[in-house]
């Protein structure tokens, strides 16, 4: 009989190898290399494939548990998708993604992390890795803080501006697999973002998505609790909130802007006078805790779900601390076999649904 504790210990001790696009993002190696070094120090069981121009990676030469992979080109943050796909075939972004594509059944890395151009990353990842069976379009998923001192997983966050009801169902399945794998929740709750809780509200697409999600819940494939509203992302009513990429991206950027504004307001008020500065000293422990809870850098690292390989997107403007969080998320996903879990859950769910619930449409996803 297998010992679950021994199995868990063995899984934790297994080596996880990540491929890192060191040239991506607004800051490139000046951010990615320090983040990689901090990540390695915190994860003795991890190895990194650092991808980029040799001269840029020179400071990492000789690092333990690191392999340098040469790439002669860089995808700029404003490069069109077609440039990344057709012209820059030796870009650090593409080479890093290629490390997670199996060759003779074995991949060089278990997950890829990049802070590069979102549209290019999604398009190249889809071209190189392809989508899983039963998935029309990949989705971007990340976590947002909630008032329960936890977080809510939200998807899609910008990969697909226009979605069908079937796409939203697939997002729910993939999001459930993500939360189950990384957070250990066997049956995470799912809500469908809408303008009200009632099933009669919303567009025809949302209504149809609700029907599909309820059917999946009736078959025991999902824990769908119904429609949720925007504020429910932050109340923690559900573990997962599903929406199209346009709405999700707006919600994400709004939340980041609000957190920044609140921090600015608090700073202004506590520096307004000598009395307020004195009050700030007294409240300093509380303020630090508040800042830590709303710091969007802690939640950096969005998963590109639905591909035949694990790819994580860091914010393009991330600093070293934020990029390290993206590495942490990729590490946890790889260690907990996220890819296998997504595949298994998709297969089980689609078998219980009508055959028209998602034939691949072959379209390249849009990027917000």
UniProtKB/Swiss-Prot annotation:
Record keywords, A-Z: Cytoplasm, Lipid biosynthesis, Lipid metabolism, Phospholipid biosynthesis, Phospholipid metabolism, Transferase
So what EC number does this one have? 2.3.1.274
Lipid biosynthesis in keyword set: yes
Q: What class of enzyme is it?
A: transferase
Q: Which cysteines are joined by disulfide bonds?
A: none
> What InterPro entries has UniProt attached to this entry?
FA_synthesis, Phospholipid_synth_PlsX-like
Reaction(s) catalysed (UniProt annotation):
a fatty acyl-[ACP] + phosphate = an acyl phosphate + holo-[ACP]
- Where does it live in the cell? Cytoplasm
User: Biological process GO terms, please?
Assistant: fatty acid biosynthetic process; phospholipid biosynthetic process
Q: Which GO terms describe its molecular function?
A: phosphate:acyl-[acyl carrier protein] acyltransferase activity
Q: Name one Pfam family in it.
A: FA_synthesis
The pathway noted for it is: Lipid metabolism; phospholipid metabolism
Listed GO CC annotations: cytoplasm
Keyword Ubl conjugation on this protein?
A: no
Q: How does it assemble?
A: Homodimer. Probably interacts with PlsY.
Q: Per the similarity annotation, which family is this?
A: Belongs to the PlsX family.
Q: What does this protein do?
A: Catalyzes the reversible formation of acyl-phosphate (acyl-PO(4)) from acyl-[acyl-carrier-protein] (acyl-ACP). This enzyme utilizes acyl-ACP as fatty acyl donor, but not acyl-CoA.
The entry's protein name is Phosphate acyltransferase
């Amino acid at each position: 009989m297998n010992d679950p504790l021994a199995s868990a210990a063995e899984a934790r001790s297994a080596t996880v190898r990540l491929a890192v696009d060191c040239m991506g993002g607004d800051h490139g190696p000046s951010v990615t290399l320090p983040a990689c070094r901090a990540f390695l120090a915190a994860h003795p069981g991890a190895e990194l494939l650092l991808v980029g121009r040799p001269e840029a990676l020179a400071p990492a030469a000789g690092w333990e548990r690191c392999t340098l992979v040469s790439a002669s080109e860089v995808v700029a943050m404003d490069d069109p998708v077609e440039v990344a796909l057709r012209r820059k075939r030796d870009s650090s972004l593409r080479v890093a993604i290629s490390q997670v594509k199996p060759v003779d059944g074995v991949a060089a890395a278990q997950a890829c992390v990049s802070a590069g151009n979102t549209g290019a990353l999604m398009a190249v990842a889809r071209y190189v890795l392809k989508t899983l069976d039963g998935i029309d379009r990949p989705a971007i998923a990340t976590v947002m803080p909630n008032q329960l001192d936890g977080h809510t997983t939200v998807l899609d966050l910008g990969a697909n501006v226009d979605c069908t009801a079937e796409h939203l169902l697939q997002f729910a399945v993939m999001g459930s697999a993500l939360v189950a794998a990384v957070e250990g929740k066997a049956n995470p709750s799912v809500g469908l973002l809408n303008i009200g809780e009632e099933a009669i509200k919303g567009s025809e697409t949302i209504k149809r998505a609700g029907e599909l999600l309820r059917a999946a819940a009736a078959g025991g494939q999902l824990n769908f609790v119904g429609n949720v509203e925007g504020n429910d992302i932050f109340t923690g009513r559900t573990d997962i909130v599903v929406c199209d990429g346009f709405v999700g991206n707006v919600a994400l950027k709004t939340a980041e802007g609000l957190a920044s504004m609140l921090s600015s307001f608090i700073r202004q008020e506590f520096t307004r006078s000598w009395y307020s500065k004195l009050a700030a000293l007294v409240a300093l422990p509380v303020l630090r805790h508040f800042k830590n809870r709303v710091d969007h850098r802690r939640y950096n690292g969005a998963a590109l779900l639905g591909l035949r390989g694990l790819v994580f997107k860091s914010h393009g403007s991330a600093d070293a601390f934020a990029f390290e969080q993206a590495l942490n998320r990729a590490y946890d996903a790889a260690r907990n076999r996220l890819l296998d879990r997504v595949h298994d859950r998709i297969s089980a769910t689609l078998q219980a649904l009508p055959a028209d619930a998602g034939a691949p449409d072959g379209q390249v996803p849009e990027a917000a």
